[in-house]
Amino acid sequence: MLILTRRVGETLMIGDSVSVTVLGVKGNQVRIGITAPKDVAVHREEIYQRIQRGDEAGGTGSENSAE
């Protein structure tokens, strides 16, 4: 596992087309923004696990929208 330190407003790149930006830190929560092509699925881990189990009904719809 690669461990990186980033400050609010800083970005890291995954490959040529995915960027992850630290939007804010409040207590023990970190808000991140992810920019990725439409053909790259981006899910929270618990949603991804539901999809893998075939339990998509438990999802909230598009995971690419802000929560």
UniProtKB/Swiss-Prot annotation:
Its main location: cytoplasm. Keywords: Activator, Cytoplasm, Repressor, RNA-binding, Translation regulation. It comes from the Bacteria. GO terms for biological process: mRNA catabolic process; negative regulation of translational initiation; positive regulation of translational initiation; regulation of carbohydrate metabolic process. The keyword Lipid biosynthesis does not apply. One of its GO terms (molecular function) is mRNA 5'-UTR binding. It is found in: Cytoplasm. GO terms for cellular component: cytosol. Belongs to the CsrA/RsmA family. Homodimer; the beta-strands of each monomer intercalate to form a hydrophobic core, while the alpha-helices form wings that extend away from the core. A key translational regulator that binds mRNA to regulate translation initiation and/or mRNA stability. Mediates global changes in gene expression, shifting from rapid growth to stress survival by linking envelope stress, the stringent response and the catabolite repression systems. Usually binds in the 5'-UTR; binding at or near the Shine-Dalgarno sequence prevents ribosome-binding, repressing translation, binding elsewhere in the 5'-UTR can activate translation and/or stabilize the mRNA. Its function is antagonized by small RNA(s). This is Translational regulator CsrA. It comes from Stenotrophomonas maltophilia (strain K279a).
